[in-house]
């Protein structure tokens, strides 16, 4: 009995320590989640002009199918564990668009480990972020510049990431960034025809500027799209991690309650058994006293009255 009681007690102490550790992780994750949520709050305002520049930030199936040159895919993955199925969803998204034109440049350690084994021919190299600092414009510029270097004659650059919808829902999203030459052709078409009426004034105003300014404008909004993608993925990561940690706390609480119940029942059973033995001994002593059993000295035999 004492061995089983000691086992339950050690288990309960271990669960209590584990619960305190996971609760601390939850508080840290919640703070990071709120910080990332504040940074991504301006996404609808900042992407308004990026959408106008690229017409459609989301991937266009027709444009991708009509591409003659390479298509650079930039899947953004997470480095941390306990983030749900974020990385698996990114891998499934890449599986659905595999083609002979695909070139991979993943972002994140787990993405590099996975895609270098799954698609060794399409994989070029990846970018690792230690995630010690929040996502910033300089990092996004570094990502898009390396994407240009991976395939200089690529038609399009597809940034695949997890878009934050709510704390419990994250969905795959794609930003479709054309090459500079393709973008200029599309800009000229928008400025000279009525095919894109919503971009007519914008295209004409930009066409009147110098070539270097147009190039800087393109690079700025391409980096801004990447910045939004990595920021969204960071927020989705913290949200998924928060939900996973909450599930861990629920599981640990149920284990604590179950072990505490077993510990209390075992302890109660041991106390009850000890009380029964004491009461039995007292009853037998009282019975002997009533029969007149007397012993003057402990080494002498009992003498009956």
Swiss-Prot record:
Cellular localization per UniProt: Mitochondrion; Mitochondrion inner membrane
One matching Pfam family: ATP-synt
InterPro entries according to UniProt: ATP_synth_F1_ATPase_gsu, ATP_synth_F1_gsu
Bilayer topology annotation: Peripheral membrane protein
Keyword Lyase found: no
Keyword Repeat: no
GO molecular function: hydrolase activity; proton-transporting ATP synthase activity, rotational mechanism
GO cellular component, one term: proton-transporting ATP synthase complex
Keywords from the named record: ATP synthesis, CF(1), Hydrogen ion transport, Hydrolase, Ion transport, Membrane, Mitochondrion, Mitochondrion inner membrane, Transport
Assembly with partners or alone: F-type ATPases have 2 components, F(1) - the catalytic core - and F(o) - the membrane proton channel. F(1) has five subunits: alpha(3), beta(3), gamma(1), delta(1), epsilon(1), plus the additional subunit P18 (Tb427.05.1710) that is not present in F(1)F(o) ATP synthase from metazoa. Subunit P18 (Tb927.5.1710) interacts with the alpha subunit with a 1:1 stoichiometry; the interaction is direct. Subunit gamma is part of the central stalk. F(o) has three main subunits: a, b and c.
Similarity comment: family membership: Belongs to the ATPase gamma chain family.
Annotated function: Mitochondrial membrane ATP synthase (F(1)F(o) ATP synthase) produces ATP from ADP in the presence of a proton gradient across the membrane which is generated by electron transport complexes of the respiratory chain. F-type ATPases consist of two structural domains, F(1) - containing the extramembraneous catalytic core, and F(o) - containing the membrane proton channel, linked together by a central stalk and a peripheral stalk. During catalysis, ATP synthesis in the catalytic domain of F(1) is coupled via a rotary mechanism of the central stalk subunits to proton translocation.
Protein name per UniProt: ATP synthase subunit gamma, mitochondrial
